[in-house]
């Protein structure tokens, strides 16, 4: 679908960091180049706000990553990793990210979600109908929900240029499990490591 993009258009970018991180890790054994994700999401329009939803791990080694995001103009909202009896871990920002997008929609012309998670389909439908916003998604197509791709006004497939959207990309074996693993791994709480370079 063709979308309208112009310099005066007000955009908000909402980044599901866990989803992109695990997709890049499982598909390309690499890290995400958030600088290029942000540039291509904004596309020379008027950025109102960019927020990355992130998880604090037990080790705390993600602090350098948070600082790197701040340097390129991305705010972070953090949540502690929950560890349940038996060792199960959970770190899920889906509801918080969707609520922020809905709350900010009246101040935006376009909402850009950086995620491939199909849980956002109801939020996308609400933003388009009740919010009157153009809704775009930027994510790795191989690990993205087919339904999410269908309901958005534009889907930017990061798999079409993995070198642009990853740092240290090495294509993983093209198996059916690679794409499923990216989605399944979401929220497992693996350590982020530090981002050495975003540009």
Model-derived segments and spans:
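Terminal and domain-boundary accessory regions
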Residues: 1-199
């Amino acid at each position: 679908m063709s979308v309208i993009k112009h310099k005066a258009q007000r955009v908000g970018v909402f980044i599901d960091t866990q989803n992109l991180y695990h997709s890049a890790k499982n598909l390309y054994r690499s890290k995400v180049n958030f600088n290029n994700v942000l540039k291509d999401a904004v596309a020379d329009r008027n950025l109102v706000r960019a927020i990355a939803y992130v998880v604090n791990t037990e080790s705390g080694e993600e602090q350098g990553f948070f600082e790197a995001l701040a340097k390129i103009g991305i705010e972070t909202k953090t949540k502690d990793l929950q560890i349940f009896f038996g060792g199960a871990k959970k770190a899920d920002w889906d509801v918080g990210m969707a609520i922020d997008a809905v709350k900010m929609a009246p101040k935006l012309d376009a909402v850009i979600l950086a995620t491939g998670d199909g849980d956002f389909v109801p939020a996308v439908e609400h933003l388009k109908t009740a919010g009157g916003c153009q809704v775009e998604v930027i994510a790795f197509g191989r690990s993205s929900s087919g339904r999410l791709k269908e309901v958005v006004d534009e889907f930017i497939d990061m798999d079409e240029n993995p070198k642009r959207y990853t740092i240290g990309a090495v294509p993983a074996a093209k198996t059916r499990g690679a794409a499923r693993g990216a989605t399944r791994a979401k929220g497992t709480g693996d350590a982020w490591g530090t981002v050495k370079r975003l540009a």
